[in-house]
Amino acid sequence: MATSSDRLVWIDCEMTGLDLAVDELVEIAVVITDFDLNVLDPGLSIVIKPDASALDNMNDFVREMHTTSGLIEEIPGGVSLAEAEYEALEYVLRFAPAARTAPLAGNTIGTDRMFLAKYMPRLDTHLHYRNVDVSSIKELARRWFPRVYFNAPEKNGGHRALADILESVRELDYYRKAAFVAEPGPTTEQTQAASATIVEKWTARMG
């Protein structure tokens, strides 16, 4: 039987900007996968109505982005922050009921997590403290396997949270197939040999 630790909780947020002191959430999407990246449900998308001051604080770039995506027109009809947190947490609990077991996943997820910690603390603390950040794998692939990086699926989520997070799942699925060792992976002997080689290489430097 699957447990909460077998799940990845994928979250993408749209904000009025990136300044945690003044900006607020305007959309959140949640998608749940297993560790084979199978999407377990179509996902949840919620538009949030922020304080007027946060909307007034949006710079031209962000306002144009949310206008082009159509989000700006939906914000006036959005739910409260409290309602959005409740709905998002209830959704996560369906698939990962045990607290602090399911990692948060996404792209440049540290930014989203900072906003979650401030504005949706109950959701944030339910998730494991570790993150699965696709952008980290992307940056390593760009330097170690350029062909893998440059042939990654093109992204066109249009800055809507649900489309963006599904693209992140797809992106990790691609890197898993293109950059990681194919299943069933290396043998125990191969991994032990690799570990010994790396330890020997770093022993002198680490004292």
From Swiss-Prot:
Similarity field: Belongs to the oligoribonuclease family.
Gene: orn
Protein name: Oligoribonuclease
High-level lineage: Bacteria, Bacillati, Actinomycetota, Actinomycetes, Micrococcales
Active site positions: 129
PANTHER family (alphabetical): OLIGORIBONUCLEASE, MITOCHONDRIAL
Main location: cytoplasm
Domain of life: Bacteria
Xref: CDD domains: Orn
Documented EC number(s): 3.1.15.-
Function (record text): 3'-to-5' exoribonuclease specific for small oligoribonucleotides.
GO cellular component terms, A-Z: cytoplasm
Enzyme's top EC category: hydrolase
Organism: Leifsonia xyli subsp. xyli (strain CTCB07)
An MF annotation (GO) of this entry: nucleic acid binding
Transmembrane domains' residue ranges: none
Sequence ranges assigned to domain Exonuclease in this UniProt record: 8-172
